[in-house]
């Protein structure tokens, strides 16, 4: 865990960044400051299988303060999977999400919320209100601007504090790229939205970026350059993005499982809608089985996975 940036930009009083991994998004914790009526808050809560660790980290960081608010930059499972556990632990906590999916949360539509299409897990949680772009939210005594950041997710928001010029970028910008552009999987054009969001970030001129995954970074122009180059490659060859998306979905589930029998993995892939969509739209020249085998081979070749055999001789895929 990394609770402070490596750069020379100090975090504001009360703000702590808990750097997680790739299964769980980073948690940004804001302790209440003297006279802070809004109370303590956390932005993004990680994946469900890490809920116990998330609870312990937040409790330790707040040093006895009760958690008053949960804020989600978007509702992918790695950003809100800890919501339910936190709501159970802190019954009075209020939960705010980006606009666009309130009704889907209230009716718990797992297809619209992406949990069914991705084959990922997220326990049901309640919401209190919305993080409206163009407004501000007060965190540790400072007003953070809320900006719409569609692309990776059409409903995502990012937060910017103008005095410190710190940006919470979610999955709109990482030091070495950005998240899978999920609308594109379904054939919804969204690469232009990614580009527009990168332009928004550039205009904000942040001094320090807190990404959804990975460490904090200050060379924003370099990160934007990497992201735009990557985006240009995806626009020029959408097949590259489709292949990237499939491998990310597979690797992400392997992070959750850590090890899985190849037959069980095949069953999961065949039952997970996004793989069917990707295969049909981009990889139809191969059979589904051939395509899956190529995905596994790609993970093995990159060192992201290892193939072994269990006591019965059946092949097992291990996370690396």
Question: In which residue ranges do the predicted regions lie?
Answer:
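Short Pro/Gly-enriched beta-strand edge/turn motifs at strand-loop
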Residues: 9-15, 115-119, 140-142
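Active-site HxH/HxHxD metal-binding segment of metal-dependent hydrolases
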Residues: 47-52, 56-139
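A structural signal for the main folded, soluble domain(s) of proteins
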Residues: 2-7, 47, 52, 63, ...
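Divalent metal-coordination and catalytic microenvironments
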Residues: 30, 44, 74, 86, ...
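C-terminal regulatory/interaction regions
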Residues: 243-320
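Conserved beta-strand hairpin/beta-sheet module of binuclear metal-dependent hydrolase folds
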Residues: 4-63, 158-170, 175
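Metallo-beta-lactamase
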Residues: 47-49, 143-238
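Soluble or luminal CAZymes and related metallo-dependent hydrolases
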Residues: 50, 129, 189-193, 287-291
């Amino acid at each position: 865990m990394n609770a402070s940036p490596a750069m020379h930009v100090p975090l504001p009083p009360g703000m702590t960044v808990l750097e997680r991994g790739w299964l769980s998004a980073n948690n940004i914790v804001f302790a209440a400051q003297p006279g802070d009526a809004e109370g303590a808050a956390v932005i993004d809560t990680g994946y469900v299988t890490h809920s116990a660790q998330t609870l312990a980290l937040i409790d330790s960081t707040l040093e006895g303060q009760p958690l008053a608010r949960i804020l989600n930059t978007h509702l992918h499972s790695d950003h809100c999977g800890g919501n339910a556990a936190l709501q159970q632990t802190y019954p009075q906590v209020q939960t705010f999400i980006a606009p666009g999916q309130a009704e889907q949360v209230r009716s718990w539509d797992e297809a619209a919320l992406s949990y069914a299409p991705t084959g990922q897990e997220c326990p049901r949680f309640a919401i209190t209100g919305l993080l409206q772009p163009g407004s501000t939210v007060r965190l540790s005594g400072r007003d953070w601007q809320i900006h719409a950041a569609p692309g990776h997710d059409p409903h995502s928001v990012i937060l910017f504090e103008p005095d410190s010029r710190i940006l919470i970028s979610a999955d709109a910008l990482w030091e070495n790229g950005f998240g899978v552009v999920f609308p594109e999987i379904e054939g919804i054009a969204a690469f232009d939205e990614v580009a527009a969001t990168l332009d928004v970030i550039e205009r904000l001129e942040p001094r320090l970026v807190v990404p959804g995954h990975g460490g904090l970074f200050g060379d924003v122009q370099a990160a934007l350059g990497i992201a735009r180059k990557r985006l240009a490659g995806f626009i020029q060859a959408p097949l590259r993005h489709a292949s990237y998306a499939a491998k990310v979905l597979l690797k992400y589930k392997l992070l959750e499982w850590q090890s899985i029998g190849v037959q069980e993995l095949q069953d999961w892939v065949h039952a997970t809608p996004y793989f069917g969509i990707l295969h049909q739209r981009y990889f139809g020249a191969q059979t589904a089985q051939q395509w899956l085998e190529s995905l596994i081979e790609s993970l093995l070749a990159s060192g992201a996975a290892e193939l072994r055999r269990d006591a019965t001789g059946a092949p097992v895929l291990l996370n690396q």
